Amino acid sequence: MRIIAGTLKGRRLEAPDWPGLRPTSDKLRETLFNILAERVVGARVLDGCAGTGAVGIEAISRGAAHVTFVDADRRATELIRRNLARCAVADGYAIIRADLGADAARPPQAAFDLIFLDPPYDADPAVVARAVGEWLAPDGLLVLEYARRTGAPAAIDGLRRTREVRAGDSALGFYARPRVKG
């Protein structure tokens, strides 16, 4: 697994073969960031259910102002630290060990411009998205990775799916608040 583009392009990340660890593939990450394009530059990003940290590190590589990595597994938070060190990333991030579903009552200090969630495929992705949806900035975008076979809802607590991308066994749902016509 490697960083696709940006200042850290080509850096290799550690991705152990743990039961339940399912890193976002290089191909799907490349598709995601091609869609997000300039939206990443200067953004505050939440990489939820972060696993290896690959999505958040890719965001740092492409100019995100700050990335918050959240994962409930101690091994994952340690892995994220190692992967950040491998890439010589010294600042511009926070790593939090927490279960997004259970610990979402603690809001962040500032809203996120981009929220990426990759919950375990056996979890209900909408439950995790609901837990952090209010952390999204007014013009922010929530991206949910889920099993293609199970799908994801068209709307989650006031956020509407604006796009879906399918690749292999995975899919990405892009959610935003509806624009108010005025």
Located regions from the model:
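Class I S-adenosyl-L-methionine-dependent methyltransferase catalytic core
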Residues: 1-182
